[in-house]
Amino acid sequence: MAHRVLLLLSLASAAAVAAAVDAEDPLIRQVVPGGDDNDLELNAESHFLSFVQRFGKSYKDADEHAYRLSVFKDNLRRARRHQLLDPSAEHGVTKFSDLTPAEFRRTYLGLRKSRRALLRELGESAHEAPVLPTDGLPDDFDWRDHGAVGPVKNQGSCGSCWSFSASGALEGAHYLATGKLEVLSEQQFVDCDHECDSSEPDSCDSGCNGGLMTTAFSYLQKAGGLESEKDYPYTGSDGKCKFDKSKIVASVQNFSVVSVDEAQISANLIKHGPLAIGINAAYMQTYIGGVSCPYICGRHLDHGVLLVGYGASGFAPIRLKDKPYWIIKNSWGENWGENGYYKICRGSNVRNKCGVDSMVSTVSAVHASKE
């Protein structure tokens, strides 16, 4: 009898501990550099239970559950490394913490390699944007404050980030041209856009298997435009093209790529609206918030996102001064990052961090109304 009571008390205690571990748990919220591996190992199962409950995760059997727990433990250690390498941001448990880095890249990153990005680094491009004046640029600017940015969307388990970047840029351009913010269709790109880069005939837009924003704009010029999300809703999977030209709500007039110069990027952002950009997403799987400015980050681009603004007041604890940053809209839902947004540092001391300046394109829209 006493043994049974002791067992019940132990189970109740374990349940209470699990319930207490929630989104505000300091390890869940942020992997603290001062912790040790033994603490992570001892508490990993409780943190994993909280993670499963918070994000509604389910696994097919006990073996899969055990495997995902082991991946979760690896990602706790990885988030700690990211925290050490990127101290001005917060890194910790996200909804992707049960995925290996390879699974994450394969499922959520879909920006195809492009020779055009290399040409831009070398100052060459067939669609180079004209140089704009940069005197008098504001210290802070955010298109969300001016009505040109739609709601944060979720690409799901589909490498269609490029389509969200392209549609977001056209949403902003269409707003500047017409004064109306339309929520545009990414699924039209996924199903119907098979445009190839002229410099790389084998690199074509391929739905959930990846694509490029510039080739997406080329497709729209040929197709006539893009339908609304309402008329052509997102499914998160490759499907048969159902494009209806009579339902076009936004069309591309022209597009160009912006030089690898932060002042020019800022000037184009203000003049043309949100910009379609590529980025190295190496630190984004564990990102929770703050200004990301990792000491080490490659410039290999693997994720398409939308640049919507910039600021100058991101606090940098290492240098005890403000760190300027870009404001980036992502396509992983509002329960990632800062309500779906990412901040990454900019400025002369950190030029082109994670390749953020390497692939930037602007688009101009013409008005297209339903007949």
UniProtKB/Swiss-Prot annotation:
Positions of the pro-segment in this chain: 19-136
GO biological process: proteolysis involved in protein catabolic process
InterPro entries referenced in this protein's UniProt entry, alphabetically: Papain-like_cys_pep_sf (IPR038765), Pept_asp_AS (IPR025661), Pept_cys_AS (IPR000169), Pept_his_AS (IPR025660), Peptidase_C1A (IPR013128), Peptidase_C1A_C (IPR000668), Peptidase_C1A_papain-like (IPR039417), Prot_inhib_I29 (IPR013201)
Enzyme active site: 161, 303, 330
Molecular function via GO: cysteine-type endopeptidase activity
Tissue: Expressed during the late stages of seed ripening, in mature seeds and during germination.
EC number: 3.4.22.-
GO CC annotation terms, alphabetical: extracellular space; lysosome
Function noted in UniProt: Involved in the degradation of the storage protein zein. May play a role in proteolysis during emergencies.
Family: Belongs to the peptidase C1 family.
Annotated protein name in UniProt: Cysteine proteinase 1
Source species of the chain: Zea mays (Maize)
